[in-house]
A protein has these predicted regions:
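Primary recognition of RNase H-like, Mg2+-dependent phosphodiesterase/nuclease domains
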Residues: 1-153
Length: 153
């Protein structure tokens, strides 16, 4: 889990991933445990209790997002582990982990907006939006090549 803090993603995404790995996201199951909600059913698929892994990975509504850019993931193996196991496997590959974290954060953001009936992008566009967001973040962090090595007097 310590690899999370080394990822080159915005702080809000690192914090989100830490919450995911600590199982303290306010999923419906976690809210039910705190006696805030009575019904833990996922509002996206309407069939299964919404825990962290379901909300971000197992829900039929979000699987298509992962299939687009993460088709190489062993789905059978991923189905048996926790979301933390999945994160641990990916953090060893920083560029992949950064896209994974940004995509998961984008799915969670979509879930929250749709639950509150706010405007969202279609689920099928989340993968591309996550890539664009990450590219923009990286370009903002990079120093302009023209200013390197020049001394202004």
């Amino acid at each position: 889990m310590s690899g999370i803090w080394k990822l080159k993603v915005p702080g809000k995404i690192k914090h989100f991933l830490w919450k995911v790995c600590s199982d303290c996201l306010p999923t419906k199951v976690n809210l039910m445990k705190r006696e805030i909600l009575a019904n833990p059913t996922c509002h996206l698929c309407g069939r299964i209790a919404e825990d962290t892994k379901h909300a971000l990975w197992d829900c039929e509504a979000v699987k298509a997002v992962w299939c687009m850019d993460f088709s190489w993931v062993n789905w059978v193996e991923a189905a048996h582990g926790s979301f933390l196991d999945l994160v641990d496997r990916l953090v060893s590959k920083p560029r992949v982990a950064e896209l994974f974290a940004t995509t998961a954060w984008s799915i969670w953001t979509h879930r929250n907006k749709s639950r509150l009936l706010e405007k969202t992008i279609p689920l099928g566009s989340i993968g591309e939006a996550a890539k664009t967001f990450l590219q923009q973040f990286r370009s903002c962090r990079d120093e302009p090549s023209s200013s390197r090595g020049k001394l202004i007097r």
